[in-house]
């Protein structure tokens, strides 16, 4: 055969981050065989084309592989009949017909809306030598994209997809270690020398027919898997939807052959193509990796035998098969492109939602930071106020002894003020007494002055009389006896005048001395009064200052005392 199928398991770490596989060793299953069709009768085929090759891979690229339980579940799928009757929203449906035999001989029936169905079974396939009498109905050869499993029927919710039978997320075991080697399917396969004679009859086939027949191979050319796992693409293509049979698996291999190389992301997309959200079938536990490899080798031998039978009968029955499977392959490719577009749009929507949520979270974070900053400022201000109150409280506590000392000093100063007031009253009384004496002395002075004036007048009159007498005496010297008597009177008057003058001078001297004494006493009294007034004013000012300090201390401590005037009156009493 000229055509060769290749599967490339290029795992994407973004979509398959939860995959796991066995760690160290890997198993390589090399199969040199032709194309496979599960629709033909089985014949004997030698086991020369199968071997097992255990070797590690150089660079691991898969994140997760298949566990033994999941692998056996893909090899031995037995579902209940009620779960196999799945209807598609587009009007198409597959139903697997089970038989009572132990071998896997169940075949699907393709249904339409008008309840017409085409059975894909051994009895419905054309027999050898009778390709013109095919049992396919006309409905099986129709190629309608919308009628065959539309995108709306394939798209399930996330919860159902996570429970899907074909999802890679359900295939990995939690306790399985990571993969040590990637899935490395061989790009081409060579035929066994024992098969070269059988392939000579197929050289006359056209390229399109050969590719169509090659697409019927369920297990593709020889490939390499890690120990304890099988290719993810093989498992998903064989079990899309959980209820498709060998014919539908052949269609998936046809699609894979047409595509060339499928990434693990596309395989994960195909694995989600569940028709409904039914739970996965019960898995069977595998004893060891050798059992899994042995079963896989047995299946590959069976498929190789079927491929040889199909090659020998290709000239008889290639026309209906190629038409049907080419249409189905084209449908699957179109649906695969639509699924890619759908999931790309979903990825864009999710990224936009994540960006919006990130922006909202950044805005909330900024608001929270501003609120935190404001609360921190309020906390700092409250702490400052608390420190100020503590300082005031400490000052008030320290001002208690100072207040007591100030009160004691105020009481002392109040006593001194009262004593000075008493002295002031005594001095004022003495001043008043001295003032009375001064007034009396002034009266006496006036009287003395009046008396002196009278005496002066009398002395002036006497002097005039004496002058007149002398003039008369000088004019009349004859009358001597009379003159002697007059002379005696004059002498007497002169003596009296001299006495009066002396008395007057003595009185004036006494008055002057008294005046000087009074003036000195007056000056003393005034000076003493001024000193008392100045000391009183100074004490009054000091008292006012102390009272202000006391009031300030009372206001700082918060105590209420009586007014200073009443307190001073109390101290004086």
Swiss-Prot record:
Main location: cytoplasm
Claim: Iron is one of the keywords in the record: no
Parts forming coiled coils: 287-474
Record keywords: Cell projection, Coiled coil, Cytoplasmic vesicle, Developmental protein, Neurogenesis
Disruption-associated phenotype: Morpholino knockdown severely impairs cranial nerve development, with shorter or missing cranial ganglia and reduced nerve arborization. Neural crest migration is impaired, although neural crest induction is not significantly affected. Brain size is reduced and cranial cartilage development is severely disrupted, leading to smaller head size. Eyes are smaller and deformed, with coloboma formation and disrupted retinal lamination. In eye, expression of the genes rax, pax6 and otx2 is reduced. In brain, expression of the genes emx1, pax6, otx2, en2 and egr2 is reduced.
Superkingdom field: Eukaryota
Compositionally skewed regions (Polar residues) per UniProt: 207-220, 392-401
A Pfam family the protein falls into: Fez1
Record's compositionally biased regions (Basic and acidic residues): 125-135
Protein name as it appears in the record: NEDD4-binding protein 3-B
Organism this protein belongs to: Xenopus laevis
């Amino acid at each position: 055969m000229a055509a060769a199928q290749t599967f490339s398991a290029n795992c994407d770490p973004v979509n398959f981050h939860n995959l796991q596989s066995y760690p160290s060793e890997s198993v390589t299953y090399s199969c040199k065989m032709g194309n496979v069709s599960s629709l033909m009768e089985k014949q004997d085929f030698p086991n020369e084309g199968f071997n097992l090759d255990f070797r590690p891979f150089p660079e691991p690229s898969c994140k997760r592989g298949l566990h033994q339980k999941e692998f056996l579940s893909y090899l031995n799928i037995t579902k209940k009949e009620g779960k196999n009757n799945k209807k598609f929203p587009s009007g198409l449906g597959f139903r697997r017909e089970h038989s009572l035999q132990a071998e896997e001989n169940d075949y699907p029936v393709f249904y339409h809306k008008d309840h017409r169905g085409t059975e894909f079974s051994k009895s419905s396939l054309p027999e050898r030598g009778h390709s013109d009498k095919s049992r396919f109905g006309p409905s099986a050869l129709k190629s309608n994209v919308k009628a065959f499993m539309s995108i709306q029927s394939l798209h399930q919710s996330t919860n159902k997809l996570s429970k899907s039978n074909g999802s890679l997320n359900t295939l990995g075991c939690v306790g399985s270690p990571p993969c040590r080697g990637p899935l490395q399917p061989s790009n081409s396969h060579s035929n066994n020398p024992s098969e070269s004679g059988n392939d000579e009859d197929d050289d006359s086939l056209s390229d399109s027919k050969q590719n169509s027949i090659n697409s019927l191979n369920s297990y593709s050319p020889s490939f390499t898997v890690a120990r304890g796992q099988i290719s993810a693409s093989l498992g998903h293509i064989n079990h899309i939807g959980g209820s498709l049979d060998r014919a539908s698996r052949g269609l998936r291999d046809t699609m894979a052959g047409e595509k060339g190389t499928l990434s693990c992301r596309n395989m994960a997309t195909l694995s989600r193509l569940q028709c409904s959200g039914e739970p996965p079938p019960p898995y069977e536990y595998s004893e060891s990796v050798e059992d899994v490899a042995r079963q896989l080798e047995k299946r590959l031998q069976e498929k190789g035998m079927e491929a040889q039978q199909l090659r020998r009968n290709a000239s008889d029955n290639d026309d209906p098969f190629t038409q049907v499977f080419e249409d189905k392959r084209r449908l699957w490719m179109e649906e695969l492109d639509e699924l890619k577009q759908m999931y790309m749009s979903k990825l864009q929507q999710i990224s936009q939602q994540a960006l919006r949520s990130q922006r909202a979270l950044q805005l909330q974070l900024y608001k929270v930071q501003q609120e935190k900053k404001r609360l921190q400022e309020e906390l700092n201000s409250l702490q400052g106020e608390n420190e100020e109150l503590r300082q005031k409280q400490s000052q008030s506590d320290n001002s208690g002894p100072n207040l007591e000392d100030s009160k004691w000093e105020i009481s002392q100063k109040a006593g001194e003020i009262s004593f000075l007031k008493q002295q002031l009253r005594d001095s004022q009384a003495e001043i008043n007494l001295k003032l009375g004496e001064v007034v009396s002395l002034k009266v006496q002075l006036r009287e003395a002055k009046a008396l002196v004036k009278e005496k002066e007048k009398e002395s002036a009159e006497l002097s005039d009389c004496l002058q007149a007498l002398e003039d008369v005496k000088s004019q009349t010297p004859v009358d001597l006896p009379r003159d002697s008597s007059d002379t005696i009177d004059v002498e007497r008057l002169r003596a009296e005048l001299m006495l009066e003058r002396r008395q007057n001078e003595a009185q004036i001297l006494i008055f002057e001395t008294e005046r000087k004494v009074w003036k000195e006493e007056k000056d003393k009294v005034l000076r003493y009064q001024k000193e008392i007034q100045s000391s009183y004013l100074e004490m009054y000012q000091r008292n006012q200052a102390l009272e202000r300090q006391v009031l300030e201390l009372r206001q700082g401590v918060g105590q209420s005392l009586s007014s200073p005037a009443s307190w001073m009156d109390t101290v004086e009493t």
